[in-house]
Amino acid sequence: KTRSYTNKMVLKKIYKALEKSPKFELIELPFIDVTEDPVRPELSLEFRQSHGRKIYGIRDEEGDIAAVMCFAFTHDIPKSVEEMDAMSRDAAMQAIHRAGVQGTIAIAYTVWAKKKGGGKHMVNEVYKMIKESNHLSRLVTLSPLTDMARKFHLKNGAKEVQVNLTTQNFEYNIELSEWEKLKGKVTEKWRNTTWSIK
């Protein structure tokens, strides 16, 4: 009886591992209904798209937007929306002289899920995008001072940077892990290997 139970548990784990995980596509959104934003509905669409700021969404397999995240790009960590506005304007002006490269820090100032689990998948997709970026080195939030925001970011792997008067900042570590560094070295070495057939 114990053996049968153990076999069932092993099979259950195998089935779970083989289950198809949902696929998402990160896309830049040209339009959103800002009134749907539960975090910062007061920020206009124009604000979210000016001075190099961007709006991203993740599209699920059904073609629906599962979550939305808005970004500003800066060189420092802002403590308020007003500071973020000024910093992203400054980074946008500097980008004119740097072939369009704007800011080294992606500031996620609002995120919301339109479908269950969308927020977590949004963080994962943005994490991948920033990790693959040539000029972004950090992913930091400008979150409201709520327990819900704190729990969400800590649960998804962020570290608290600072608590401000009206906001709090969390940072997602986007440095390559040791495994990823080793994988990169092995891949590069393999590409540079001359193969000969004898």
Give residue spans per PLM region:
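Conserved beta-strand-loop-alpha-helix junction that forms the acyl-donor binding cleft
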Residues: 113, 140-151, 164-171
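Conserved acetyl-CoA-binding loop-helix of GNAT-fold acetyltransferases
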Residues: 113-131
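A short helix-loop-beta-strand connector motif used in the catalytic cores of GNAT acetyltransferases and
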Residues: 45-61, 72-81
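Short glycine-/small-residue motifs
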Residues: 65-68
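Conserved acyl-donor/pantetheine-binding loop and adjacent beta-alpha core of acyl/acetyltransferases
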Residues: 70-107
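Conserved acetyl-CoA-binding loop of GNAT-fold acetyltransferases
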Residues: 154-164
